[in-house]
C-alpha cells in the first residue's frame, strides 16, 4: 500500500511518514499535483496556523487538486481542520469539503489552551480503528464543530471531534503518530479503506 503525504513545506510530516512506514506503507512526500492525483491514498498533515497553511496550499496550486480528490484523503490535526469550510483562526477560508467551522478552544478553570496531552475517546464508528476508551495525544488550540461527520469525540471544555469521516475523507484532530497503539490502528484502518 502506498500513501502520498502532501508536503506544504512545514509541519510534522517526517514523524507521520515514519508512522506509515512502520505499518509497511510506501510513503512519498510531494507537493506535485500529478503525484497527488495518482496516489492510492493521500494524507494532509499539518501543524501551525490555518491562514499560513491555506496560503501555502494556494501558492503551490493544490486547492483544486485536494478538493477534486475522490480517493481516500486523511487530514491530520491542522490538516483535518483544513477540510472544513473555514477557521476563526485569522478568519481563514479553508477547503470547504465538510460543512462547519473551526473555532478557538476557550480556556476554563482546570483547562489550558492549547489542549496538549492525552484525552479519552468516545467512539461511534469503530471502522476507523479506534475503540471507546482509547487515549490519544492532542496538541491544538482550535477545534472543528461537532457534527454528523464526527466518529470519535473527546472533551476539552466542550465536545470536540477527535476523528471525522465523510465519503472519501477521514480526519484526526489528534496526532496518530504520537498516539501509540490507538494511533497505529487508526492509520492502519486508513491504509485499508
Regions found by a protein language model. Give the residues of each.
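Extreme N-terminal starter segment of soluble prokaryotic enzymes
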Residues: 1-4
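Conserved Rossmann-like nucleotide-cofactor binding loop
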Residues: 11
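Cysteine-nucleophile active-site neighborhood
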Residues: 48-115
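An anion/phosphate-binding loop that grips the pyrophosphate of nucleotide cofactors and donors
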Residues: 39
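Structural motif
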Residues: 43-45, 171
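Amide-donor transfer/coupling interface in amidating biosynthetic enzymes
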Residues: 68, 101-193
Amino acid at each position: 500500500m502506498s500513501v502520498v503525504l502532501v508536503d506544504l513545506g512545514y509541519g510534522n510530516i517526517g514523524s507521520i511518514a515514519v508512522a506509515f512506514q512502520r505499518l509497511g506503507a510506501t510513503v512519498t512526500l510531494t507537493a506535485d499535483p500529478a503525484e497527488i492525483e495518482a496516489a492510492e491514498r493521500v494524507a494532509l498533515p499539518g501543524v501551525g496556523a490555518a491562514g499560513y497553511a491555506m496560503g501555502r496550499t494556494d501558492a503551490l496550486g493544490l486547492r483544486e487538486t485536494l478538493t477534486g480528490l475522490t480517493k481516500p484523503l486523511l487530514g491530520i490535526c491542522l490538516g483535518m481542520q483544513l477540510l472544513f469550510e473555514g477557521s476563526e483562526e485569522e478568519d481563514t477560508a479553508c477547503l470547504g469539503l465538510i460543512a462547519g467551522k473551526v473555532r478557538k478552544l476557550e480556556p476554563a478553570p482546570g483547562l489550558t489552551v492549547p489542549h496538549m496531552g492525552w484525552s479519552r475517546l468516545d467512539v461511534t464508528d469503530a471502522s476507523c480503528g479506534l475503540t471507546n476508551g482509547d487515549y490519544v495525544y492532542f496538541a491544538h488550540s482550535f477545534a472543528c464543530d461537532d457534527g454528523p461527520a464526527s466518529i470519535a469525540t473527546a472533551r476539552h471544555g466542550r465536545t470536540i471531534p477527535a476523528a471525522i469521516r465523510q465519503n472519501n475523507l477521514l480526519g484526526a484532530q489528534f496526532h496518530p503518530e504520537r498516539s501509540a497503539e490507538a494511533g497505529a490502528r487508526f492509520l492502519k484502518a486508513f491504509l485499508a479503506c
